[in-house]
Every structure is written in C-alpha cells, then in structure tokens.
C-alpha cells in the first residue's frame, strides 16, 4: 500500500494558531522529502474517516486539548492508524501538570514546591484562609492552569494581593490550578527523539518569563544551543530528562522543560508530547545542532510512529 500521511493540525484548543503554523511547517518538511502528505484540520474534518480517505499514517501537529491529551490518540488506536508521539496514557497524563508532578515526586524526581487548588476549594474557601495556604512557598509565585500549554493562563505573582487576579485568570482555563514557588534561574529544555537525547537549549526571554508572546510572537527571546552547561551538567540534565520522560511512559519524541534555581539545582516543569514545530520552536533548533535538517527531523519523527 502506498503511504499517505495525514498531518493533523489546527483543532479547537487555545493553541490552534500555533498548531496551524506547526502543521504547515511539518507538511512542507515531509513534502520536501517526497512523502505523500496532506494537511487535515481536525476542526473541520472528522478524524474517524481518516482510514476511509486512504490515510495510512498520522503526524500529530496538534497542541493542547483534543490533540495531545490522549483523546485523539485513543481514536487513532481504535482506527488502527500509526501516529507520531506518545500513546493514550502518556498523552493524557502529561497534559495534566499536577498529575505529572505527582508521578515524578513518587519516583523521587525534583519538582518545585507547589500547592494544587481546584475550583470548588477556590469558591468555598474564605479569602484569608485561601491566601494562607501559599505563604510557605514565599514570593514571587507562578500560577498556572493544570491542563493548558504554551503558557496560556499563566501569571507571575509578586505580592499576595496580586494572587486573586492570577487565580481568576488560571481558573478561566481549567478547573485545577497550580501555585508554584517562583524559580529564579534560567529555563532549559531538552528534546528527545526515539532513544536519543538532543543537546539542551537555554532560553532567555526579554520579559518576566517565557510566556506565550515570548514563545511565538517575540523576536527578542534568545536561545542558546549549545546551552553553555559544562559537560557534567549536560550529561546530568540529559539523564534527568530521560528519567522524567520514561517515568510518565512517553515514546516517539517529546520535550522536557526545566528551571535551574539559584541553588544550581534543576527542577522539572513539564513534558511536551507534541512540541511546537514553528520557526520559533525548540526541537528543530536542537536537531540542527545534531546535524539534522527540518525535513530530516520530521521524517525521523514519522518513522518513530507507532
């Protein structure tokens, strides 16, 4: 049977616009390699008919809910279509930052101190009692929805008086929210391709933190690859990335994000099971450092589909 690849993009999540950019870049890379690939916007096209339309493989370029949360992966498993990235369980788990942290904690991997809060607790708890839950974390804080990507709904809190507004913003996007200790050091990210850990990247946003604008819109964010770590630090970070990736049963490809705190210790932030593939994206940057062109990278990811 002749290979016909569906590049799933767009969708209906808060990350739709980024997904459209990722998907078009992936599509161009696959076509450059001579692969019969077609863009499929899951907002408009029923994925249940992919097999009927003659597709034999799926490259998932969707971000956020409905694309990397296990839902789509379950449908593709049912259809018997090979797809890129992690399976149902790993996709569902890593979409939820709280549950991912809990798994990492259980196996002894480093995560920043945090408090989890659900909407019911938030609505039922008196304001002063609510604020008292977070005092042991110190200031500043970072507030984020548990199940959003691309820093959607995320806020930095410098004083406790700013916390209610930050919680309101996070609860606009999810019923579960994380309030974490602010880590003051630089952010690093490590891409994984099959069983290979790619070189780390150090991220230096122009603003307060690596938010949506810094990730996708700003040309002022600086990226360093090589990241400037010593060989010993690079090896330790690579080992930590792979341990975190395997602890949540990821496969195929992905990206693990870290913060380096003022105590020179790395803390895990999250795993991305369907990382961005835009002109600002990090996995292609790390792959270039290993000598892979963008087209070679997307072909390799497709070859890892299961």
UniProtKB/Swiss-Prot annotation:
GO biological process: one example: peptidoglycan biosynthetic process
Residues that bind Mg(2+) 1: 257, 270
Cross-referenced InterPro entries: ATP-grasp (IPR011761), ATP_grasp_subdomain_1 (IPR013815), D-Ala_lig_Van_CS (IPR000291), D_ala_D_ala (IPR005905), Dala_Dala_lig_C (IPR011095), Dala_Dala_lig_N (IPR011127), PreATP-grasp_dom_sf (IPR016185)
Keywords associated with the record: ATP-binding, Cell shape, Cell wall biogenesis/degradation, Cytoplasm, Ligase, Magnesium, Manganese, Metal-binding, Nucleotide-binding, Peptidoglycan synthesis
Signal peptide region: none
GO cellular component labels: cytosol
Subcellular location: Cytoplasm
Positions bound to ATP: 134-189
ATP-grasp domain: residues covered: 101-303
Taxonomy, superkingdom: Bacteria
Cofactor: Mg(2+); Mn(2+)
Residues bound to Mg(2+) 2: 270, 272
Designated name of the protein: D-alanine--D-alanine ligase
Naturally occurring in which organism (per UniProt): Pectobacterium atrosepticum (strain SCRI 1043 / ATCC BAA-672) (Erwinia carotovora subsp. atroseptica)
């Amino acid at each position: 049977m002749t290979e016909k690849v569906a590049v799933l993009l767009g969708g209906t999540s808060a990350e739709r616009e980024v997904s459209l950019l990722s998907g078009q870049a992936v599509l161009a890379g696959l076509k450059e390699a001579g692969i019969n690939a077609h863009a499929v916007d899951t907002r408009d096209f029923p994925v249940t008919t992919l097999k009927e339309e003659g597709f034999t493989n799926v490259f998932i370029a969707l971000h956020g809910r409905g694309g990397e949360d296990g839902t789509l992966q379950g449908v593709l498993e049912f259809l018997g279509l090979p797809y890129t990235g992690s399976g149902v369980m790993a996709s569902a788990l890593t979409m939820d930052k709280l549950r991912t942290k809990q798994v990492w904690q259980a196996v002894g991997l480093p995560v920043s101190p945090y408090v989890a809060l659900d909407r019911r607790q938030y609505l039922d708890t008196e304001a002063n009692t609510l604020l008292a839950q977070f005092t042991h974390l110190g200031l500043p804080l970072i507030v984020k929805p548990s199940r959003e990507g691309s820093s959607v709904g995320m806020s930095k809190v410098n004083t406790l008086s700013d916390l209610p507004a930050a919680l309101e913003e996070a609860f606009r996007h999810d019923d579960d929210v994380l309030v974490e200790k602010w880590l003051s050091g630089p952010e690093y990210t490590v891409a994984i391709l099959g069983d290979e850990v790619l070189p780390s990247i150090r991220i230096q946003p122009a603003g307060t933190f690596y938010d949506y604008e810094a990730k996708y819109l700003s040309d002022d964010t600086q990226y360093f690859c090589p990241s400037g770590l010593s060989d010993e630090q690079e090896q330790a970070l690579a080992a930590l990335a792979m341990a975190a990736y395997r602890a949540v049963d990821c496969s195929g490809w992905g990206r693990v994000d870290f913060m380096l705190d003022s105590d020179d210790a790395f803390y895990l932030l999250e795993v991305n099971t369907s990382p961005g593939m835009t002109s600002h994206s990090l996995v292609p940057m790390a792959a270039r450092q290993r000598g892979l062109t963008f087209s070679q990278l997307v072909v390799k990811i497709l070859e890892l589909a299961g």
